[in-house]
Amino acid sequence: MCIRDSYSHYQTLTVDSAAEEARWNEMMEAYKDEFPELKAKWETYHYPLQAINTYNDDSYWEFEDKPQATRNLSGVMINRLKDILPNLIGGAADLAPSTKTYMKGEGDFSSTNRAGRNLHFGVRELAMAAIANGIALHGGLRPYVSTFFVFSDYVKPMARLSALMKLPVTYVFTHDSIGVGEDGPTHEPIEQLAMLRAMPNFNVFRPADATETAAAWYYAATATSAPTALVLSRQNLPQLKGASRLTLRGGYILQDSEKEVPDAILIATGSEVQLAVAAKAALAEEGIDVRVVSMPSMDVFDRQVKEYQEKVLPNAVRKRVAIEALSGFGWGKYVGLDGKVVAMPGFGASAPANLLFEKFGFTVDNV
């Protein structure tokens, strides 16, 4: 009897709810006809892919051709996107000057300024991410949060809920490796990147230059059912020849071999892509012709069709080296039993960044 009564009750609710939805849709159509400008804003707020018609707009992808930290480039992108997405809102855990996440001219959100788009979360990373989840659950707004990458440990429980609830929250993590330098091992992330990559429905990008950073932000800003993390450098990185919007496919051929079948493949992310490029040039002098693959997002690359994956990483090439100045965990699936991984063997140390990269084997000769 209880089951039958419950079924009857919910059948009634279904009919009533359908009628309520129809009334709501009718009201919305009338609203759109009466207020076309507000209708356009509504569409922008709720359908970001329609708003961001920038993929073929060259100005979106233009940057100064000089070495820049990807955290700085991310800051440039945030201030470009704020004009395209008026519902973009976000901030940092008391680190906005360092994470470069402040939207210029948009004011600070407060009890007296609800229109402010910069949120000051304070030094409370977990609460920051929880607040962003709430904003995303409400709908209409596009939240982003930021802190140093090593502090992603504090963010992780709420980031996991972002993934579980399919919320398009953007996580901006800077100071992404031993490139942090003198701050030492307490502030040099090692295992954090592998941790985030292991999370289901969570897209992680570690871009190498301006083009890849712009592509990562494009991906994050148009996401609808998954969070995205941007893992960014403190130190300046060169703009790379061959960097491509193919970043949106997770991994791509940055610089190819002249041979149909390369002698070997070098795979890298972020600040180590420049090292792979330099190693390719050095190997060429020895008559070894290699391909350089940039892999800004394992998660996205793993979802590509097999034909594309085979084109980038052909099975016929067994000699592969992955290079990343963090934990090497997870690279085995790309390099295989015949490959090598140049990664951090343990915690970092306190010294200038260039000395640390040399100490831990991130050199052309070692690669």
What are these regions (language model features)?
Residues R4-D5, T12-N366, ...:
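Thiamine diphosphate
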